[in-house]
Amino acid sequence: MALLQTVVPILVCIGLGFLARKKELLTPEQTGGIQQFVLKFCIPPVLFNSCLEAKIGAESLTTMVMLLPVLLLSSLWAFRARKKRYPYHNFPMLFAAHETGMIGLPLCIILFGASEAYRMGILDMTQGLISIPVMVIVASDTGKGAPIKTIVKKVLLSPMLIMSLLGFALGLSGLMARLDAVGVGGIIRQTTGFLAQPVSAAMLFSIGFNFSLSSENRNEIFKIAGIGFLFSAAACLVMQGVLFLVPNVDALTRWVVLLYCTLPASYLAPSLSRNNKESVLTSGVCSLLTVVTLISFCVIAAFS
């Protein structure tokens, strides 16, 4: 019953999103507005509160150090494969980052609580060191005329990144403790906590609304998704093996690493397409891997 209490609300939210699209209760523009509200105004406070209490120990540093070469190798392989086998301009973006924002953080909050979201936030910031350069390279030749400087600036000024760094700074410096002493800290926590409430339901609704698996290029979609899954599985085994060597590793760190490795490719990938074929293909890959994520989530919820 405990598992059902976790899983059923998720399936209901996703199902409502799918129903809303099928019955045309909302337009894509309206759903996009919901996503932008959550990404810009709700998830940043979650990360802020979580990072305030974050403890950056050996295990956190270990996951950061491990993740960088893993994503670097997969990205380099993707660029090479793009030349020889998969001639899709945005192909490398499918291997440069996982979707921590729209799905990783909400699922992490549901499983482990908002106070542990910083663990996923650390992985999100770490993957940015690889995904941002890959995004710049891919976006520089989309044919849409988006300047590289503009793209980099947009990523670096992301509310999620800014609020995460602010939370770390206030927490680790001890400044938040001083604000707590004069009563200001409590007001900040209550305000940010209130803003964070819609995150899980809104984002899961959006996932259901945007789910798409076109019959066009279905074999190619399954093949690329399978490759992505194998890369993620190998990365998970390596990272879990290294964490095994680190003394006194918190079990939550292992679970969050496992959850991260099951996440789909970044939902930014379709937006970097040069044509409809690339958009359909990458959207299909992301949607298929999202199904894998939700199945994995149920397994993690049952055993964590």
Give each language-model segment a name.
Residues 1-304:
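Alpha-helical transmembrane segments of multi-pass small-molecule/ion transporters
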